């Protein structure tokens, strides 16, 4: 029966997909891709949910079928745009190709061009691996971008499965937790980016901690530990696993500005609660993470301290800008997509809280999973993260929240005959089915509801290629924004080449498309070799997310075409590029990428701090490896105590140097 449901679900889901051509995609409105999907596709997605839920009924797991349905669900949910859209989706993924192109062309980074160059680890690793594999052609790189989200979501299942094995629960709860994770991965941070790469590192790091480095916990007050005891391992094997955990963190630090601090927060709270055996790990990881920010990410914060860290403590303002601030304005239909995201995140977190309570009632004490689920919320007190902090918080909270949500339906471990008898008559699989149907329906709306402007159209790519070809020595490209001060990321396949030679200038989009005079004036002020681009993706964004009229793009293009001082230099079905008929006087300025990174201001205090930090990392790392050789409850050895006292003065010097750098350079 489950195999038949799986086959029927896949057939219903994929057979109508070839009928989704470019004309059908052009009809997308406020609901995005789900608004143009044939009903059999939706029925197929529901059948995949039913197939998995049916497999939760038997007394023994059918692992092969469970795995097949899970993988088929992930592929179906995440591969759809890659199959139906002519170009790889999402504008920022194209921009990240520009980082690879710049690295390949110049051999270095350019911190003055973009703050992300202060964390170049992902771009350097991707450029190295792709070149080693012979992937250098732009068409081949585009295919990497196309299939990257699917690969990330499939790879995420591996650490999730390991994380699920750390929970003292029955097989239904473990499989259901991984399933809920897959159905709730609609956040959209899986595109070709440092965030998606470091998210995989975060999942693997958390799985290692909870599987092999949980501190021993004995039953107390009639409550059993909610986590399985770590497997027996020799000191040598534990040392190797610790080395892997440190390598994962070390790979995340130079690749992303947020992920290492989430990893640090999780391990710190686990240590404070007595649930992590690596008691010295927070200090070691903290020195590494803060040291990178203070020294190698100096261009990111130097001179912008208040702008970057002024949001610390502003919990209410950060939550508002991340949640309600992203829903204001826009079309009523598209607001359903934004409200569905809030509702789905709230549903998963509510199920997680219910799961914690049901585990408590069943006699299990959960500590580790709530840490994974709720520690990321501390990000709200740090920064608004460009209005995206709510999405990032849910992204990092999802592994723990999904497993806790599964425990709401299957709270017992099934280790006693009484628990097994209860599971045989429980209607929990039916309840999980209903939850799965809600989650998969919500996924299709929340994940693909922005596709009208997150989709990349062929004509937009052609227009950008024309711009790159004419960026000699530089070019200013004006694009239309509803708020040039706050909305600074265009819905265009921008930045994939010539990073230092194209300056993107957000320009106020007139609410009344007839009033296009300020656009021509902005072109004059931009100077020679300046162009104005009007793309369908950005126009769709303005209509759906900023409340511009549905006829706005058509009327604006007619107005621009009618002006005597403007001439279209590119015109196709998806984009138009305009230039002044009489170019402004002057000579285009030369490209100024700035000095190659890393850019560090060295003072005597900085040199002393860097040397102290390096020695401190070595001492703390050696101390942690030595502690692994002792029994869990054994007192510290003389060598461990000696390393601690040697580390104290180095820590004081390092902290003093870091404070001095922030104070003098901020």
Question: Each PLM stretch: what is its role?
Answer:
Residues 20-33, 131-139, 313-339, 585-600:
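Juxtamembrane membrane-water interface segments that cap and precede transmembrane helices
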Residues 70-77, 148-233, 237-264, 437-442:
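Membrane-embedded helix bundles of polyisoprenyl
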Residues 150, 407, 417-424, 432, ...:
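Extracytoplasmic
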Residues 65-75, 241, 245, 266, ...:
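Transmembrane alpha-helix segments characteristic
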Residues 56-61, 227-239, 276-282, 350-373, ...:
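Membrane-interface helix-loop-helix junctions at transmembrane boundaries of multi-pass membrane enzymes
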Residues 38-48, 148-150, 257-258, 314-358, ...:
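Alpha-helical transmembrane segments at the extracellular/periplasmic loop-to-helix junctions
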Residues 195, 387-418, 641-654:
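Hydrophobic/aromatic-rich transmembrane helices and adjacent perimembrane loops
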Residues 54-69, 75-199, 453:
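Active-site lumenal/periplasmic loops and adjacent helix-entry segments of GT-C-fold
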């Amino acid at each position: 029966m489950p195999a038949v449901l799986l086959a029927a679900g896949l057939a219903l889901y994929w057979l109508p997909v070839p009928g989704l051509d470019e004309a059908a995609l052009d009809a997308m409105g406020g609901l995005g891709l789900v608004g143009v999907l044939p009903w059999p596709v939706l029925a197929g997605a529901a059948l995949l949910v039913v197939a998995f839920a049916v497999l939760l009924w038997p007394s023994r797991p059918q692992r092969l079928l469970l795995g097949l349905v899970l993988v088929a669900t992930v592929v179906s949910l995440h591969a759809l745009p890659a199959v139906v859209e002519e170009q790889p989706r999402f504008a920022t993924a194209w921009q990240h190709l520009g980082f690879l192109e710049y690295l390949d062309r110049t051999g270095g980074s350019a911190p003055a061009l973009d703050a992300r160059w202060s964390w170049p680890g992902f771009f350097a690793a991707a450029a190295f691996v792709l070149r080693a594999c012979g992937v250098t052609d732009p068409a081949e790189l585009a295919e990497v971008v196309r299939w990257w989200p699917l690969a990330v979501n499939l790879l995420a299942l591996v650490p999730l499965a390991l994380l699920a094995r750390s929970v003292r629960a029955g097989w239904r709860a473990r499989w259901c937790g991984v399933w809920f994770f897959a159905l709730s991965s609609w956040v959209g941070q899986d595109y070709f980016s440092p965030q998606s790469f470091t998210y995989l590192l975060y999942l693997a790091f958390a799985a290692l901690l909870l599987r092999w480095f949980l501190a021993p916990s004995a039953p107390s007050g009639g409550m059993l530990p909610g986590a399985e005891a770590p497997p027996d391992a020799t000191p040598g094997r534990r040392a190797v696993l610790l080395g892997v955990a440190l390598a994962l963190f070390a790979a995340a630090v130079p690749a992303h500005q947020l992920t290492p601090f989430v990893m640090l927060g999780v391990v710190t709270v686990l240590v404070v609660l007595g649930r992590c055996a690596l008691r010295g790990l927070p200090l070691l990881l903290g020195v590494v993470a803060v040291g990178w920010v203070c020294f190698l990410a100096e261009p990111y914060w130097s001179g912008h301290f208040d702008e970057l860290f002024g949001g610390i403590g502003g919990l209410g303002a950060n939550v508002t800008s991340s949640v309600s601030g992203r829903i204001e304005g826009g079309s009523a239909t598209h607001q359903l997509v934004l409200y569905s995201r809030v509702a789905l995140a709230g549903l998963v977190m509510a199920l997680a809280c219910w799961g914690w309570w049901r585990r408590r009632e069943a006699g299990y004490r959960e500590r580790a999973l709530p840490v994974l689920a709720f520690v990321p919320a501390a990000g709200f007190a740090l920064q608004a993260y460009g209005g995206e902090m709510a999405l990032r918080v849910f992204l990092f909270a999802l592994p723990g929240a999904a497993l806790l949500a599964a425990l709401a339906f299957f709270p017992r471990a099934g280790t006693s005959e009484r628990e097994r008898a209860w599971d045989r008559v429980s209607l929990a699989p039916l309840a999980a089915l209903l939850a799965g149907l809600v989650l998969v329906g919500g996924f299709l709306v929340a994940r693909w509801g922005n596709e009208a402007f997150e989709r990349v159209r062929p004509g937009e790519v052609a227009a950008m290629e024309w711009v790159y070809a004419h960026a000699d020595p530089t070019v200013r490209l004006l694009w239309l924004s509803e708020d040039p001060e706050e909305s600074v990321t265009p819905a265009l396949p921008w930045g994939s080449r010539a990073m230092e030679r194209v300056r993107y200038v957000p320009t106020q989009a007139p609410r009344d498309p007839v009033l296009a005079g300020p656009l021509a004036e902005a072109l004059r002020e931009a100077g020679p070799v300046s162009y104005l681009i009007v793309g369908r993706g950005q126009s769709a964004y303005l209509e759906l997310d900023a409340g511009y009229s549905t006829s706005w793009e058509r009327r604006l293009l007619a107005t621009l075409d009618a002006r005597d001082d403007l001439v279209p230099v590119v015109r196709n079905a998806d984009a138009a590029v305009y230039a002044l008929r009489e170019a402004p006087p002057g000579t285009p300025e030369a490209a100024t990428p700035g000095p190659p990174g890393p850019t560090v201001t060295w003072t005597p205090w900085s040199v002393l701090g860097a040397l102290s930090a390096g020695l401190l990392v070595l001492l703390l790392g050696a101390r942690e490896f030595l502690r692994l050789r002792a029994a869990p409850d054994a007192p510290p050895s003389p060598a461990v105590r000696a390393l601690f006292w040697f580390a104290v003065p180095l820590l004081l010097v390092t902290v003093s140097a870091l404070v001095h750098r922030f104070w003098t350079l901020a």
